[in-house]
C-alpha cells in the first residue's frame, strides 16, 4: 500500500466496514483520497470481493478521478467504477439479453437532437394541433424538459407505462411547463418514436434501469447479488431516478456509503435536491461522518465562505476547517458602473499576467452569461485571450443575434450574404405562426430582386386574412426600422424594437425552465445597456464586427492558453489559483429572478471555494451590495483573518497587545481550533498560547473579559495547548484598556471631507480625495479606490 498521510476524519471513513454510511465532505476536502483508501482496505482485508464493489457518481469527472486513483493498486483493478447512467444502461442491457425488452440501439449523450428532428417531422406529418408552435421550438430547452422529467421519474403517459403498484409511490405523471402545454404532447410523441425505434438515450439510462428493477424481480435479484458494497460520490447531485435506483440495488445489505456536500447542491432546477443527502441518515439509519478539512482554500476564502453558508437553514451544520494557512487573499473592489467594473477586472488580470501567472490559472465566474458583454470587451481591448465555457461570445448568442438580425435586414440595399440566415432566424421570432413554406416563398422573391418589404406585401396579397395580417405587420415593422436607422441611436432603436416585439417576454415564455428563459431575457437587457454608448446602428454593427475580428481565435483552432469565463454552475468540482467574481450585488448574487435564496447562497459559496490562492470580488457602488456579503460581515471577517494571520507569523516576544488580542478574539471566531492543533505546527505554539492565556488572565483580573469581547470558548481554545501561562514581563499588556469595546450609541455617522485621513479594514489608512453621491474616492497605499460609504465602514483617524 502506498504511504499517504490521512487525517483522523479520513481514517474514520477508511475504517468503515459494513452498513449504511453518510459522509459530508466540504469543498476541497480530499474525499477521493479517503474513498479510494477505503476501497483499497476493503479489498486488501477481503471484506468484499473487488468485482462485487461498485464506486459510482452522477459526475463523469468524479468517476474518472476515482478510476485514476484506484489504478495505483493492482488488487483494486476489479472494483467496478462507473457513472450512474452507465449503471442504468448495464441493467437495461441485462434485461434485453434475457429477452425481457427490445434494445436495438443505444444512443450516447447528444443523439437526442437527431431523434428530436425525426419526432418533429412526425408531428408535422400527423398535422398535430400544435404544429405551428414547432416553428419556435428551442431544441435544447425541450430536451432539458425531457431530461428533467426522466430524472424525476415523471412519465409522459404514466397510465400507459403500466408500472407495478409499488413503483407508483415514486413515479408520477409529467406536467407541462406553464404556458407550454404542448410540451407534454411533444414529450409523449418523443417517447412513442423512441420506443418504436428501440432507442435508449442518455437521459433514459437511470430511469429505464430503475424501471427494469421494479418490473422484473429476477433481474433485481441478479443486480443486488452483483454489488455487495456500493459507494456513491457527489451524492448531492443525484436526482430521484438515481436515488431510487440505488435504493433498490442496495436493499438486501445496505452496504451503502453516500458522499457529498449539501452546501454544494446547485442543480435543483434539473432535479437534484439537498433533501436526498439530508434525509439519507434518517432513511437508512446511516452512520454519519464529516470531513471538514479543506486542502484547497487559504484562510480568507475559508473564513468568508464559511460565514456565508452558515446563514442557510436547510443544511448539515459543519464548518470549513483551514489547512493551508494565510497565504491567500480576498480582494473586494467597488466600481461605479459595469464598464468600470470590467476595466478593473481586466486590469487585475493583466497585472497578474505581467507578474508571470498563466491565463489557464484564472477564471471569471458569473451567475448568468448575461454578465459577460463588458467583461469580454475589456479583455479584447487588452488582447487577453479568453474563452466562454458553455456558451459563445456574447455577440454570437441566439437571443442577441435575434435582435441584431432585425437591424441587419433593415439595412438599405440588396440583401446578400448571411441575410437568408437572419431571415430564417426572425420570421417567427416572436411567434407569428408563419409556416416555413411561407418564409421560403418570401425569400424566393427577395432572391429574385424584390426588397423584403415588397416580398412580404406581395405574399400577403395572396394569403388568407389571418396570415396576411401578420405579414403586413412584419412589413410595417421593417418599414419603421428602416426609417429609424439614421435617426435614432443604436441603444434607443434597440430599446424601441425590444418593446415593440415584447422580446424579453417572448424569451421568458418560450422556455420550459424559468432559469433558462430568464437568463436569455437578462442577456438582452444587458446587451441593450451595453449598446448605450455605441453610437448609431451602423457604429454598433461595426463595433461588433471588430470585436469578432479582434477576439483572439477559436479555442478549438488556437492552442493558446486562455482565461476562462463560465457560470458558477459549471465551476463546481474545479479549482483555480485565481478567481474573479463580478457583480456581487443584490439582483445578481442572489439573482432577482430566483425564489430559492438558499440555493443562491450555495451558488455563492461554491464560487468562493474555487480558489487556491486569490479571489477578487467586484461590486457596483451604485447598487446594493450582495446581502450574502453584508450578512457575513465580510469586512470584519477579512480584517480578522488579516490580523490573526499577521500575529501567527510573528515570534511570541514580538506580539503587541493588539496582536495578542487579535489571537485571543479571532482564533475562535474564525473557527481555527482544528487548524491550530493539527496544521499550524509552529515551534513557538506553546509560547504563543501562554502569552494569549496571560492576556486572558490580565483581562479577567481587571474585569474586562466581556468588554474586550473575550469568551470562555475562546479561552478554551488556547487552554487546549496544555501550557502554563507563566509570568510575563512587567507591563506586558500596557494599554489593554484602549481596546475595550464601546457600547453602540445612536450617535450620528461620521461626516467625511476631502483631505480627511481614514482607515479601511482591508485597505488600511488612506486619504479622502473626493466625495460624490455617497461614494468616497480614497487614496490608499496600493492605489485609489471608490467606496460606497454605506458599506465601506471607514474610520476617521
Give names to the regions the model predicted.
Residues 3-15, 19-27, 62, 80, ...:
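Conserved helicase NTPase motor core
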Residues 22-23, 27-35, 285-287, 293-384, ...:
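Helicase P-loop NTPase motor core
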Residues 1-102, 221, 303-306, 609:
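P-loop NTPase Walker
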Residues 180, 415-417, 430, 458-570, ...:
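Accessory C-terminal helicase-associated subdomains
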Residues 80-90, 231-234, 259, 368, ...:
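Conserved helicase core region in the C-terminal RecA-like lobe
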Amino acid at each position: 500500500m502506498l504511504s499517504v498521510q490521512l487525517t483522523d476524519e479520513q481514517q474514520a471513513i477508511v475504517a468503515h466496514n459494513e452498513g449504511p454510511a453518510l459522509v459530508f465532505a466540504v469543498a476541497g476536502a480530499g474525499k477521493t483520497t479517503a474513498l479510494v483508501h477505503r476501497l483499497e482496505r476493503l479489498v486488501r482485508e477481503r471484506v468484499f470481493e473487488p468485482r462485487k464493489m461498485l464506486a459510482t457518481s452522477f459526475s463523469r469527472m468524479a468517476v474518472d478521478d476515482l478510476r485514476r486513483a484506484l489504478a495505483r493498486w493492482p488488487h483494486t483493478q476489479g472494483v467496478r467504477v462507473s457513472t450512474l447512467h452507465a449503471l442504468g444502461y448495464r441493467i437495461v442491457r441485462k434485461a434485453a439479453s434475457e429477452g425481457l425488452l427490445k434494445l436495438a440501439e443505444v444512443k450516447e449523450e447528444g443523439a437526442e437532437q437527431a431523434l428530436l428532428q425525426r419526432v418533429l417531422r412526425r408531428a408535422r406529418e400527423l398535422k398535430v394541433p400544435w404544429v405551428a408552435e414547432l416553428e419556435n421550438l428551442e431544441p435544447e430547452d425541450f430536451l432539458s424538459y425531457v431530461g428533467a422529467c426522466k430524472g424525476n421519474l415523471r412519465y409522459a403517459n404514466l397510465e400507459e407505462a403500466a408500472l407495478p403498484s409499488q413503483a407508483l409511490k415514486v413515479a408520477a405523471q409529467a406536467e407541462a411547463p406553464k404556458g407550454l402545454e404542448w410540451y407534454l404532447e411533444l414529450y409523449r410523441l418523443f417517447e412513442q418514436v423512441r420506443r418504436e425505434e428501440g432507442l435508449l438515450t442518455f437521459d433514459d439510462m437511470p430511469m429505464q434501469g430503475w424501471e427494469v428493477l421494479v418490473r422484473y424481480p429476477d433481474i433485481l435479484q441478479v443486480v443486488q447479488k452483483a454489488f455487495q458494497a456500493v459507494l456513491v460520490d457527489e451524492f448531492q447531485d443525484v436526482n430521484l431516478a438515481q436515488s431510487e435506483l440505488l435504493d433498490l440495488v442496495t436493499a438486501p445489505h445496505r452496504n451503502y456509503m453516500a458522499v457529498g456536500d449539501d452546501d454544494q447542491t446547485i442543480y435543483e432546477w434539473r432535479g437534484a435536491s439537498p433533501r436526498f443527502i439530508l434525509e439519507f441518515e434518517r432513511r437508512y439509519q446511516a452512520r454519519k461522518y464529516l470531513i471538514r478539512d479543506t486542502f484547497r482554500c487559504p484562510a480568507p476564502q475559508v473564513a468568508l465562505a464559511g460565514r456565508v453558508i452558515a446563514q442557510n437553514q436547510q443544511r448539515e451544520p459543519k464548518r470549513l476547517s483551514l489547512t493551508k494557512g494565510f497565504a491567500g487573499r480576498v480582494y473586494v473592489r467597488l466600481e461605479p458602473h459595469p464598464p468600470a467594473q470590467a476595466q478593473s477586472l481586466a486590469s487585475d488580470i493583466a497585472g497578474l499576467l505581467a507578474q508571470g501567472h498563466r491565463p489557464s490559472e484564472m477564471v471569471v465566474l458569473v451567475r448568468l452569461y448575461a454578465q459577460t458583454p463588458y467583461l469580454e470587451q475589456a479583455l479584447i481591448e487588452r488582447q487577453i485571450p479568453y474563452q466562454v465555457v458553455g456558451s459563445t461570445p456574447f455577440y454570437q448568442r441566439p437571443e442577441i443575434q435575434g435582435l441584431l438580425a432585425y437591424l441587419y435586414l433593415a439595412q438599405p440595399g440588396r440583401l446578400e450574404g448571411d441575410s437568408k440566415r437572419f431571415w430564417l432566424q426572425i420570421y417567427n421570432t416572436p411567434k407569428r405562426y408563419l409556416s416555413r413554406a411561407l418564409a421560403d416563398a418570401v425569400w424566393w422573391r427577395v432572391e429574385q430582386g424584390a426588397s423584403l418589404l415588397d416580398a412580404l406585401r406581395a405574399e400577403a396579397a395572396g394569403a388568407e386574412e389571418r396570415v396576411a395580417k401578420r405579414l403586413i405587420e412584419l412589413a410595417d415593422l421593417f418599414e419603421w426600422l428602416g426609417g429609424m436607422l439614421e435617426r435614432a441611436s443604436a441603444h434607443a432603436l434597440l430599446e424601441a424594437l425590444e418593446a415593440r416585439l415584447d422580446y424579453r417576454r417572448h424569451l421568458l415564455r418560450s422556455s420550459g425552465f424559468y432559469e433558462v428563459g430568464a437568463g436569455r431575457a437578462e442577456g438582452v437587457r444587458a446587451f441593450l445597456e451595453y449598446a448605450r454608448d455605441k453610437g448609431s446602428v451602423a457604429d454598433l454593427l461595426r463595433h461588433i464586427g471588430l470585436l469578432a475580428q479582434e477576439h483572439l481565435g477559436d479555442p478549438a483552432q488556437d492552442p493558446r492558453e486562455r482565461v476562462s469565463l463560465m457560470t458558477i454552475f459549471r465551476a463546481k468540482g474545479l479549482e483555480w489559483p485565481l478567481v474573479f467574481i463580478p457583480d456581487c450585488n443584490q439582483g445578481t448574487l442572489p439573482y432577482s429572478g430566483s425564489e430559492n435564496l438558499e440555493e443562491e447562497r450555495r451558488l455563492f459559496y461554491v464560487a468562493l471555494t474555487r480558489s487556491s490562492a486569490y479571489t477578487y470580488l467586484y461590486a457596483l457602488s451604485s447598487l446594493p451590495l450582495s446581502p450574502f456579503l453584508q450578512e457575513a460581515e465580510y469586512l470584519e471577517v477579512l480584517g480578522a483573518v488579516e490580523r490573526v494571520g499577521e500575529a501567527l507569523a510573528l515570534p511570541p516576544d514580538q506580539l503587541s497587545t493588539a496582536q495578542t488580542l487579535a489571537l485571543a478574539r479571532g482564533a475562535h471566531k474564525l473557527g481555527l481550533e482544528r487548524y491550530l492543533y493539527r496544521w499550524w505546527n509552529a515551534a513557538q505554539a506553546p509560547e504563543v498560547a501562554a502569552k494569549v492565556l496571560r492576556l486572558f488572565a490580565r483581562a479577567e483580573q481587571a474585569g474586562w473579559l466581556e468588554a474586550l469581547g473575550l469568551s470562555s470558548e475562546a479561552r478554551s481554545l488556547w487552554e487546549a495547548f496544555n501550557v502554563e501561562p507563566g509570568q510575563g514581563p512587567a507591563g506586558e499588556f500596557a494599554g489593554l484598556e484602549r481596546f475595550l469595546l464601546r457600547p453602540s450609541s445612536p450617535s450620528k455617522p461620521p461626516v467625511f471631507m476631502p483631505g480627511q485621513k481614514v482607515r479601511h479594514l482591508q485597505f488600511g489608512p488612506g486619504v479622502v480625495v473626493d466625495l460624490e453621491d455617497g461614494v468616497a474616492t480614497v487614496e490608499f497605499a496600493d492605489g485609489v479606490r471608490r467606496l460606497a460609504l454605506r458599506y465601506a465602514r471607514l474610520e476617521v483617524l
